[in-house]
Structure formats: structure tokens, C-alpha cells
Amino acid sequence: SDIASKKISCELISPMDATYYLGTMLGGYNVEPLISLLDDPECGDAAVKALSNTLLVFDAFNDIAEKSKSSENASKVLKSWAEAEWFLSKPEVPERIDTIIFKVPGETNTDDLSPAPDAWSRPDIPLHALSMYKMPREGLTNEPLKEIEELKKKGLPVALVGDVMGTGSSRKSATNSVLWHIGEDIPFIPNKKTGGICIGEKVAPISFNTMEDSGTLVFEADVENLNMGDVISIFPAKGEI
């Protein structure tokens, strides 16, 4: 924020770059500096764009609303929020998604994905994710994570498929582990992923909601004829496989 407001200078990061990077924080400590930059001659437009895609503003909404009485750029931010540009600018859900299956027979509970003995490592998602499916089980190889990596080499996204998915209480750390292996990188947020595909004959409601909130395409379907390594096409709008 000091670079963006020109309190200090940096040869590597310009004030415009700094304003852009503030906008990648999604909310919190970046909000007040961005509001102060709205009327900056150099960075004002970049601050508008950054705030238009920032939702975690909390009480600072009132500050922007008050500022909009005298600031055109603050008015632009309110208009962008009102028109939900942050949402409508996102990529549309594809009409068809081709994916390759990683199937785990039987019930997968959150302890399979985020084992309690490894709870100490849950804040470190890449490390904790190494414990996913660490306990041997029938129908799964002894090195399941390596098998996921082999499936990825086919060039398609990997879908986690099971009979019963996500029972148990550790749904967030379990989701983090799953997405670390089959999800997509989040720009400017290290060591965490989004997206991914999960299909279950039954999916526990709290895990279903947590996966949805994490950007996962998760749904229930008949998985009896879906087998490890199968390539399938999902048609989200039609609700068909």
C-alpha cells in the first residue's frame, strides 16, 4: 500500500502494479488503501477495478457509499457491485466437460481424506494432502496419489468418484486435500486450490456444500458403471453423463 500511495518507491513494482496486487487480496487489509486510491490521478482506475472485484469489504461499504457522493470512481464501484460484474465476468460453465475417473469403492469419509493423526499438518495444505487415502483399502492401490498423477498425464481433469463421499466432520480440510490433487491453482493464493470434480452415489450434505463453496463441480449420480481410468463427458446444464 505504501508503494501504491507513493510513500515509498520501488524499482521492481510501480504504483499501478502495487494497486493491482492489492486487488488480488480479495478483502480485508487491502480495502482501506484501495478506497484512499480511488481519486488518485494515476491509480484511481486500477483501484476501481480492484474494488469492483472485492467483496469482503464489511463496514467499508459505508465509506465507499459516502465517498460516492463526491467521487465518480466510488460511484463506479457501487455500480459494478450492483450489476454483479464480479460474478458475471467469470468464465461460463462449459457445455461439456471431459474428465478421467479416479474411483474409490465404498465409503470415503473425511478421515480418509484428512486423517485425524495428521491433523497437526492441516494448515499446510500441500503437506497434509500427502496423507489422503494413506490407509490401505480394498479396491485401491497402495500408492493412490501416484495413480492420480498417472491419470493426470492423460491430459484431462481427474474426477474423484465414489459410492459414498464426505461423511464425517473434517469437511474443509478434506476438501482442501482433494482439491490439492485434482483442483486448479488460484491466482496469487499459494498452497491452495479450487475447482475439481467429485461424483458420488451419495455425498454427505456438509461436504457437498463445502466443495461447492470451494468451486468444485460436485453432484450425485449412479456410479456403478463408472470405473477407474474411464473417460467420461459431463453435460452440466443437461444433468447428464
Regions found by a protein language model. Give the residues of each.
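Phosphate-handling active-site elements
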Residues: 180-202
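N-terminal, positively charged, Ser/Thr/Ala/Gly-biased leader segments
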Residues: 65-123
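Glycine/serine-rich anion-binding loops at beta->alpha junctions
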Residues: 157-180
